[in-house]
A protein has these predicted regions:
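Short loop/turn segments that connect beta-strands within beta-propeller blades
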Residues: 37-41, 86-87
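Beta-strand C-termini and the immediately following turn/loop, strongest in propeller blades
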Residues: 22-29, 36-37, 69-75
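Beta-sheet repeat architectures centered on beta-propellers
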Residues: 6-9, 19
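Structural motif
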Residues: 1, 29-36, 76-84
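Serine-hydrolase catalytic core recognition
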Residues: 47-48, 52-167
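Surface loop/turn motifs at the tips and blade-to-blade linkers of beta-strand repeat domains
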Residues: 2-7, 47-51
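C-terminal, active-site-flanking charged/polar segments
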Residues: 1-3, 39-42, 162-167
């Protein structure tokens, strides 16, 4: 099988290159980008810097290239366009969303992925962001928004509005 069936994985998109097959997947509510050499010599998932993120392939029109262009953002990282060399496994950030005001510093925030158990035993992913100087306690204020049913989820994305609320 080129792409074997996995019960807990949703295939969202594919990109076909001369030497590579790139499969966009969703597992446990999170995007993944799986890169496979056609000759079977290498198969790996793109590594990402955060537990909570959104990643997706963008337009890749050159069949002969070894460079994959994709989009990435997380709760703490502005939207970025990245070129990834599938041979050397190196990435180059081509563009990152500018955050106006000059006060945003990524290192002031942290994010994590938690799991809640529903009454039927289903595991529900939770993406959490906070300032690093905010204490985690039951008394800490929390803004919760959610949606996840019928195969649809809210991807963890960067929001300047949310950052101002955290500040």
């Amino acid at each position: 099988d080129v792409i074997p069936h996995r019960e807990n994985v949703l295939l969202e998109d594919i990109e076909i290159f001369k030497d590579f097959l790139v499969v966009s997947e969703r597992e446990n509510g999170l995007n993944q980008i799986h890169i496979k050499r056609w000759d079977g010599s290498d198969s790996y998932y793109l590594p990402f810097d955060s537990e909570t993120y959104t990643a997706y392939t963008t337009t890749n029109i050159d069949f002969d290239t070894t460079v994959l262009r994709y989009g990435y953002q997380s709760l703490t990282t502005p939207s970025s366009v990245i070129d990834f060399d599938m041979v050397t496994k190196t990435k180059t950030i081509k563009k990152e969303q500018e955050v106006l005001g000059g006060k945003f510093k990524k290192e002031n925030y942290t994010s994590e992925r938690l799991w809640a158990t529903a009454t039927d035993g289903t595991q529900i992913p939770i993406s959490l962001i906070r300032r690093i100087d905010t204490e985690k306690s039951p008394e800490t204020p929390l803004l919760l928004y959610s949606y996840g049913s019928y195969g649809n989820t809210i991807d963890p994305y960067f929001s300047t509005v949310r950052m101002s609320l955290l500040d």
